[in-house]
């Protein structure tokens, strides 16, 4: 699933034309869902009405082909409940949820936060577990309490950077909790360890390659997946960087499905920093691999 970027015009308005172009590229590549309003989506800079516009537009564009998921990253429980309500009104299929923002909630507070929001909606929820960047970890004991209390908590975006955590989660929760890798540079390793999916970043610029890796890995064609992944890794490393938004938007420009515009306080890359990123992108494009017919992988069997 792509965690898509938010497209802006030169005068800092939503660029819905380029947004639609990118979503169609994702659908053409065979993605299994669209995630809006994450870190890559510059959610912290978006107005509430803009988030709602993006959800409605995405729902219109995908036309039922794949689920549309909106991220919730709020400072208060009341605001999170309100965001969930609006997601339903706007036609979203599910929610991705970070722990409370700014305030570092303890385990009990985090559990109550998730439980209260989950109980306020019928939408399925994917917990975004990223203690590295956000400072709060949802532990296995916390997951056990949440899964017992909330049937609509169904998945985790696993971004702890601990590959063994995938095995531990599978051993403890089995199919009750779907696991999606949330770190581009650990994606194939995570799939080999049993992750169910991949919430991806560079997919915004390279949708076909990303989906090919996923489909090949799931079909047991690991050597083919690994060959593409090795080519992809220098590009994937652009996602594990504080300038990931700017990096990936540069890549989207290079592949013709995005613009470089970001929203302040972010600024476009300049100088040597920009040139280094462009060199990585250009090297990747020069050696871009031919892909197998990954869309018909199972009909070939």
Region spans (language model):
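Short amphipathic alpha-helical/adjacent loop interface patches that line ligand
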Residues: 23, 114, 150, 229-232, ...
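Active-site beta->alpha loop and helix N-cap motifs at the rims of alpha/beta catalytic domains
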Residues: 2, 6-135, 145, 291-292
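Glycine-rich phosphate-binding "P-loop"
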Residues: 129-130, 152, 263-264
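C-terminal alpha-helical cap/extension of soluble enzyme domains
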Residues: 1-7, 29-31, 195, 199-301
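Short, amphipathic alpha-helical "lid/cap" segments that border enzyme active or binding sites
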Residues: 16, 20-23, 140, 274-281
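A general structural signal for well-ordered alpha-helical segments in protein cores
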Residues: 19, 51, 55, 80, ...
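Catalytic alpha/beta core domains of metabolic enzymes, predominantly
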Residues: 119-120, 133-242
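Short secondary-structure transition/capping segments
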Residues: 46-49, 82, 107-110, 138-140, ...
